[in-house]
């Protein structure tokens, strides 16, 4: 299965396409988006997007009513319908994160008196 993100300003965000066809946003949520981001090699997700946020999509959809647990390694492992009732303004999308969810990066800056911790 080939997953791509289309229409976003960079490689970590866009409308989700599976084998060249869009995914419908009916029931689309953060768990679904997490599976997509993980499948694309990103460690986490910032947001699941709806309503073709990254541009209108073709009206022939690959998946509808996607329902993931967040533990799947592939979007195709998630429950979904193949028959859709979606329009070009119902593309599902993601904004993937380059950092693990909940992790803060800590930087210690050494000064003359004492270190400064920057989060």
Descriptions of predicted regions:
Residues 1-119:
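Intrinsic disorder and flexible/low-complexity segments
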């Amino acid at each position: 299965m080939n997953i791509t993100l289309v229409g976003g300003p960079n490689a970590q965000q866009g409308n989700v396409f599976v084998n060249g066809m869009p995914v419908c946003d009916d029931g689309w949520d953060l768990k679904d988006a997490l599976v997509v981001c993980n499948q694309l090699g990103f460690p986490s997700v910032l947001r699941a997007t709806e309503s073709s946020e990254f541009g209108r999509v073709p009206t022939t959809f690959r998946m509808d009513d996607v329902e993931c647990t967040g533990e799947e390694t592939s979007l195709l492992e998630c429950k979904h319908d193949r028959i859709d009732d979606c329009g070009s303004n119902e593309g599902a999308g993601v904004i993937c994160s380059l950092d693990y969810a909940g992790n803060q990066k800590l930087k210690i800056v050494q000064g003359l008196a004492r270190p400064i911790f920057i989060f």
